[in-house]
Curated annotation (Swiss-Prot):
Belongs to the Msh homeobox family. Its main location: nucleus. It is found in: Nucleus. One of its GO terms (biological process) is regulation of transcription by RNA polymerase II. GO terms for molecular function: DNA-binding transcription factor activity, RNA polymerase II-specific; RNA polymerase II transcription regulatory region sequence-specific DNA binding. Gene3D superfamilies: Homeodomain-like (1.10.10.60). The keyword Glycosyltransferase does not apply. Keywords: Developmental protein, DNA-binding, Homeobox, Nucleus. CDD domains: homeodomain. Residues 101-112 have a biased composition (Polar residues). Residues 122-181 bind DNA. This is Homeobox protein MSH-A. The gene is msxa. Residues 18-62, 100-124 are annotated as: Disordered.
C-alpha cells in the first residue's frame, strides 16, 4: 500500500517535471519565434527605430566625409591660386628686368598718311615739265588765261605735250592766280585801315580852327586858352600820342617829333 503511494508520488513528480520542462521549452520556442518574427517584420517599431539610427549614423558619416573633402578641395584651390599668382608676378618682374629703359620704336618704311587729306589710290603722277615748257606756259598764260580748243591743240603740239596736260596746267595756274589776288586784296584792306587804334582816345577833340575849339570845348577845361588845332591824323605814318608831338613857340600849333 505504501509502495503504491510512493510510486504514484514519484510518477507524479516525474510528470510535473516533464510538464514544467515542456512548458519551459514551449516558452523558449515562443520567445525564439517572437524574436524571429520581430526581426522578420520590417515595419515594426524596433525595425524602424534601428533603420533610423543606422541612417542617421550613415548621414553623419557622409557629412563628415564631405566636409573633409571640401576642406581638402579648398586647400588645393588656394594653393593653386597662390602658385598662379606667384608665377605671374615672376613673369612681370622678369619682363621689367629684360625690357630696355629707352626702347626706340621701329620706324615705318612707308610714309604716314595724313587723315585730313584724301589720298586717291589711282592718282596719276605729276607731269615733270621742263624749264622751257614752264616758261612757254607762263608766257602764254600772261597773254591769255583761257585757250580755245584749236589754240590748245596747237600749243600742246608745239611743246610736245598732250591737250589734257596743257588744260590741267592752265586750270591750276588760274586757281593760283585767284589765290594770289585774294591775298593781295586782303593785304590792301589791312593797309587801308586807320592807324589810330579805336581803343586809344584823346582827352580833347581834334579841331582845325581855334574859334571852333573854343566854342565847342573851351568851357570844359580850367584853362582859359583856346584848344590847339591839329592836322588830320591820316598824314602821319605812326600812331599819334603825347610823346609824338610838341608845342611850338607860339603855343597854337603842334609839330610832330
Amino acid at each position: 500500500m505504501v509502495l503504491t503511494q510512493n510510486v504514484d508520488t514519484f510518477s507524479g513528480m516525474i510528470s510535473a517535471n516533464h510538464k514544467s520542462k515542456v512548458s519551459s521549452d514551449e516558452d523558449d520556442d515562443d520567445h525564439g519565434s517572437r524574436s524571429v518574427r520581430t526581426q522578420s517584420l520590417p515595419f515594426s517599431v524596433d525595425a524602424l527605430m534601428s533603420t533610423k539610427e543606422r541612417s542617421e549614423s550613415t548621414s553623419q558619416g557622409s557629412i563628415h566625409m564631405t566636409r573633409i573633402i571640401n576642406q581638402d578641395d579648398r586647400s588645393i584651390y588656394s594653393d593653386s591660386v597662390d602658385f598662379i599668382k606667384r608665377r605671374e608676378s615672376a613673369k612681370e618682374d622678369s619682363a621689367w628686368i629684360n625690357k630696355p629703359r629707352l626702347s626706340t620704336s621701329p620706324r615705318s618704311q612707308s610714309p604716314t598718311i595724313c587723315p585730313l587729306r584724301k589720298h586717291k589710290t589711282n592718282r596719276k603722277p605729276r607731269t615733270p615739265f621742263t624749264t622751257a615748257q614752264l616758261l612757254a606756259l607762263e608766257r602764254k598764260f600772261r597773254q591769255k588765261q583761257y585757250l580755245s580748243i584749236a589754240e590748245r591743240a596747237e600749243f600742246s603740239s608745239s611743246l610736245s605735250l598732250t591737250e589734257t596736260q596743257v588744260k590741267i596746267w592752265f586750270q591750276n595756274r588760274r586757281a593760283k592766280a585767284k589765290r594770289l589776288q585774294e591775298a593781295e586784296l586782303e593785304r590792301f584792306k589791312m593797309a587801308s585801315k586807320p592807324i589810330l587804334h579805336p581803343g586809344l582816345t584823346l582827352p580833347f577833340p581834334l579841331c582845325t580852327q581855334p574859334q571852333t575849339a573854343a566854342l565847342v570845348c573851351g568851357q570844359s577845361f580850367p584853362f582859359s586858352r583856346h584848344m590847339l588845332p591839329f592836322a588830320p591824323i591820316g598824314i602821319y605814318s605812326t600812331p599819334m600820342g603825347y610823346s609824338m608831338c610838341h608845342l611850338s613857340k607860339d603855343g597854337y600849333s603842334v609839330e610832330p617829333v
